[in-house]
Amino acid sequence: MKFKTLIFSLSISFFAGLMYQCQVSKNSRANPSKEVQQLVDYMVGDFSSQAQSVRDSDFYDIRLHIRPIWKNDASNHWLYVEQATAAAEHKPYRQRVYKVEKEASGGVKSIVYTLPDPEKWAGKYKTPEAFDQLKPSELSLREGCTVFLKKQKDGSFIGATQGTDCESTLRGAKYASSIVTVTATELRSWDQGFDEKGAQVWGATKGGYEFVKIK
């Protein structure tokens, strides 16, 4: 009888432990998804570096617009990103599409793509449904330019590109790097280009641009 009681107790302990492990596993899978949504919510909006440009003339007054696109794709988060000087918002100098998803290590990654015929999409952050005419398969992946981010204790996300595989030819550069911090009210981005010897040839030297969310 004592032997049966022992077996029963062990069985209860085993199944309780198994159920706990399943719950932990379930939670560990769910948390990254919540972090992805939180990061996307932080990123979507209109941003300005005007305040920084007033404080420091080494920085330009830049406008950054980020909008969700392809909302019918329930399994992925796609963002259209447009960047232009405040003096020429109708002529963006950078247009990208980001695919934001959970990363295998538990963080979040933002995969970077370029658009075909980017001029056609200039200003389309105002009407993001226009991207329904475009398919994800028509985008071009920016190899090595993915930004890997981790959520911090204060709720912000901090991350960067990895290695030297994000190709750039601007001003004699060989590769580019990005260091990013995202909060509910601000997006900081430090983009730099380096030549084959590792010397910086473009980008801010003091630190990143500080984009304050204005809408």
Task: Locate predicted features.
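Residues at beta-strand starts and edge strands
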Residues: Y60, S75-H77, G106, T185
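N-terminal glycine/threonine-rich, aromatic-flanked beta-hairpin/loop signature
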Residues: L64-Y93
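Calycin-type beta-barrel ligand-binding domains and close structural analogs
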Residues: P32-D46, Q50, A87-K215
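Short, charged, low-hydrophobicity "junction" segments
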Residues: Y20-V24, V54, A160-T164
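A generic structural signal for short, non-catalytic loop/turn and secondary-structure boundary residues
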Residues: I12-F15, A74, V182, A204
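Short, solvent-exposed loop/hinge segments that bridge or flank secondary-structure elements
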Residues: P32, V36-Q38, S49-A74
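Bacterial Sec-dependent N-terminal signal peptides
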Residues: M1-A30
